[in-house]
């Protein structure tokens, strides 16, 4: 991982406010795609709603390269820093 990506991952924890649910899902999916690659995990069970949302968000990025996901993650964190500010 690039130092820029690692800094973005650290910065997101220092936002003044917690991003909304959709933003958190996007952050999660981009982070997983950038660090792991395509989702190859089993789909969560019917009662695990949070797990299913996270799994689906990551699954939607299937085929995106780790590099592209990392770049998109960095850009998205920059948007969130502008929107929410830093602590």
UniProtKB/Swiss-Prot annotation:
Gene3D superfamilies: 1.20.80.10
GO molecular function, one term: long-chain fatty acyl-CoA binding
This protein's UniProt keywords: Cytoplasm, Lipid-binding, Nucleus, Transport
Protein name: Putative acyl-CoA-binding protein
Family note: Belongs to the ACBP family.
Pfam families: ACBP (PF00887)
The organism's taxonomic lineage, starting at the top: Eukaryota, Fungi, Dikarya, Ascomycota, Taphrinomycotina
Function statement: Binds medium- and long-chain acyl-CoA esters with very high affinity and may function as an intracellular carrier of acyl-CoA esters. May enhance the activity of the ceramide synthase complex.
Entry keyword Transcription: no
Binding-site residues, an acyl-CoA: 13, 28-32, 50, 54, 73
GO cellular component: cytosol; nucleus
Domain of life from the UniProt record: Eukaryota
InterPro entries from the UniProt entry: Acyl-CoA-binding_protein, Acyl-CoA-binding_sf, FERM/acyl-CoA-bd_prot_sf
Principal location: cytoplasm
Organism this protein belongs to: Schizosaccharomyces pombe (strain 972 / ATCC 24843) (Fission yeast)
Cell compartment(s), UniProt: Cytoplasm; Nucleus
A single GO BP: fatty acid metabolic process
Domain ACB: 1-86
